[in-house]
Structure formats: C-alpha cells, structure tokens
Amino acid sequence: MFDTMCVAARSMPFWCVANPLSDPFGGAVQPAPDALDVARMLAKAAKNGLIEMTSAHDDDLVPWDPAHPEDDLDPKSDVYKKLRAIKKVLAQGGLKINMVTCSLHGSTLFRAGGLTNPDAKLRALAARKVERCLRIGHLLGAKHYTYWVARDGFEVYEKTDFAHIYDWLAEGLNHVTGYIEKMKFTNYKGATLEPKPNEPRGAMLIPTSGHAVGFIMTRLNKPAFWGVNPELLQHEGMTLL
C-alpha cells in the first residue's frame, strides 16, 4: 500500500542535520553535533511549522558496541538514557518519527556485507543489530523500518557466493518481520526495501526498484508488509531511469 505521508509530509532526517559536511573526497569541515542537540534543532523546526516528521539510522542516535548488543534495554547504560532524552525532546516539539533504518555500513565489521556477509557469525551479529534498531524504533514510535542495501553487494563477481547470498538476504529480512511479531511491536505499519545500483559496493544485490519488487514478491514471507523506497531523485537517478 502506498503511504501518501512519504510525499505529503515535510521531513528532515537526523543524518542530514548531523552531517559534518564531509564527503568521499575530503574530511569533515565542522564537528558533528551530538544527537540530542540534533533532536533539539529538529524539534525547534517542528515547533516553527517547518517539518512534521523525521527519520534516523540507529547510529545517528546512539553509538553501537557489538559487545553489548542489548544496551538499549539496560536502564543503567548511557544508550538507554540517551534514547529516552531524545524521545522527550522530540515529543516536546510534536515531532514524529516516520522511519528508522539500521546502519549496517558504518562499522568495519560489515565491510563484506551485513545481512549477506559470508561469515555466519557476522550475519548473526548484523541480525542482533537490526533487532536493537527495531527496539529503538518501537521506543520512538517509528511508523516504518527501512532496509537499505548498504554493503550487501560485491566487487568481484567470481568471488561472490550467488548460490547462497540471496537466501541470506531473505533470511535477514524475514527476521525483521519475525522479530516485530515476536515482540508484538504495533507501531510498525510496514517496512521498505531501499535499492541502490552501486556505492559503497561496486555493485549491489538489489540495484533498482524492479529488483526490489521482485525480491519482495518471491522471497519474503510477508510481502504485503513490505514496500519500496525508490529514492527517485537520488539512488534511482544513478541508473538513469
């Protein structure tokens, strides 16, 4: 089902406001603001009638420590406290979270892929990180979860395990809906698959919207729950479509 809010609502994501103005060709030109300061800026924008919604990667909000995959559940942890402080600020501004997405590209652990990493232990770690992201989204009342292909791709065709790699991806995405059901998260109205033809990998496993639709309809357990985030002016534009 098409969600008109994705085009009707004005939104500004955490990662745009927090960007230190770096790019692949040069480093940051200003310090990255703290996530709580970003939340305050976004809440102020909402109060001034400039935006209605925001979105975030899990790593935009709090740091991730693979040694403590459930720190968001520990009332004594800084992550637990930070998330609730962010939630309070956003609520005071009347700002809603439209979408959360799990960063499976920022850590060097996932250089060879997140959900499709050839190392089963790293795939399992990626799944734990996705679970944490879904819990964060539940806390903040996110409407959607988005999977971006990120590092799930390849550079060398001959070294890629095509006999299994799409099975691993399906397993990872089916785990999303399975975990939402297991935890009885009712805030999520759906999830989306966000394709990209290349970057940061040489080639992606889900390069276009057509590939995304085909994968959803043929490989996922609950296709009706999934949609496509086409990034028409960004990722899809890279394919010259």
Q: PLM features: what roles do these ranges have?
A:
Residues 54, 147, 191-193:
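Buried hydrophobic side chains on well-structured beta-strands
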Residues 1-139, 144, 174, 223-225:
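N-terminal pre-domain/capping segments
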Residues 105, 139-152, 185-188:
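A short mid-domain helix/strand-loop element embedded in enzyme catalytic domains
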Residues 106-120, 145, 151-169:
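Short, flexible helix-coil linker/hinge segments at the edges of structured domains or between repeats
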